[in-house]
Amino acid sequence: MSDTPHEPGKISYPAEVVLKPWGWEKIWAHTDKYVGKILHINPGHRLSLQYHEVKDETIHVLSGILKVYSTKLQIEHTMSEGMSWHIIPGQIHRFEAPEGGQPVVLLEVSTPELDDVVRLKDDYNRVDD
């Protein structure tokens, strides 16, 4: 994954696809002020239980049913197409595409700190020590 922002004023550039153990993400915008991604979560998979120290993000469900967890808000909630969630720095959260369902596709817009992830639990042994 490149941390180099896209060239200002350039009309078209290839989106960067990053394979993940839970699916993939496509980085379609990367500037010094924001990042835009599309996340594809395979059924039965989930992202790390994590938080960000600086990164501020908002997700929007494009398709599928997304299970979200937040320990700060003490919620386990289901989001469907058209729903959005703003996640602030320090808020512990996790996304999941339920087993037997459809893949979940999310639009994510965030501040540009791509490597600001503190993993607390992870199904793929990527927990930070």
Please tell me what each predicted stretch does.
Residues 2-14, 18-20, 94-129:
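Double-stranded beta-helix
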Residues 38, 58, 74-76:
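Short, surface-exposed secondary-structure edge patches
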Residues 51-53, 60-61, 78, 97-100:
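Short glycine/proline-enriched turns and hinge-like loops at secondary-structure junctions
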